[in-house]
Amino acid sequence: MNYGFIKTAASSLKLKVLFGHNTFNAVLINHNSALEKNVKLLVTPELSVTGYTCADLFFARTLLIESERAVAELADYIKGKDIVLLVGAPVPFFNKLYNCAVVIDKDGVKGIVPKKHLANYNEFYEKRWFASGFDFKEVQSISYAGFDTKIGNIVFDLGSGAILGVELCEDLWVPNPPSSFLALCGANIIANLSASDEYVSKAQYRRELVANQSARCVCAYVYSGASVFESTTDLVFSSALSIASLIIDVLKLTSATLSFKLLAAVFINP
């Protein structure tokens, strides 16, 4: 925090689908760039550790093991550093697999938030692999990436008045987004880890959706979309990044660039 402001960033990754260690290195590049710019909250895309487009390989035990190992390595790397990092990972829990946001800070894995609304129409069929976060009627304990932590509907106190809520992609596109309830629970920053593909006119609609939800919840909204390197199947992704905060009338939107470092960063007042 700096005079009541916190610097946040939405980040795209130069990843290789399935290769957890490669993604680990990509996150480190963006993380180090974020530290240089004094970013305190860094948000990466949905399933950023493995890639969103793994399809039936989400059933592979090796993928889940390597994903958890990559999260453990990230947690170890940022230990003691003044930054909060959000990464997306598939998390197994009681014989079900959840599409999750993993919140990591200087002390380790701070908590895990599962995606509630699974996209299962047209080009999406997430219910084939994942269970819904609505399974969690209350917060549960979990051992993950070497840490005893919590999984479920969690808001995170980042200190100095900054309260973080998390949702994932489709959660924003439904009539009653989880972020609305998170705001009612005190969240003044919402992070969205997303893998929204592209088609004609969708970019503008998505941009307005982020801005409108920020206004509706009277909070900052940090949106990180899947990298262009996810475009390995019949879906096209554009590294869509947005940060909206109506409190200071700021809206930033960037598309993919060749640097793939820190693509969107802004001070917000929580």
Regions found by a protein language model. Name each.
Residues S238-I248, K252-L263, F267-P270:
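Low-acidity, Ser/Thr- and Arg-rich intrinsically disordered low-complexity segments
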Residues M1-V250:
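Enzyme catalytic cores with a strong preference for nitrogen-chemistry domains
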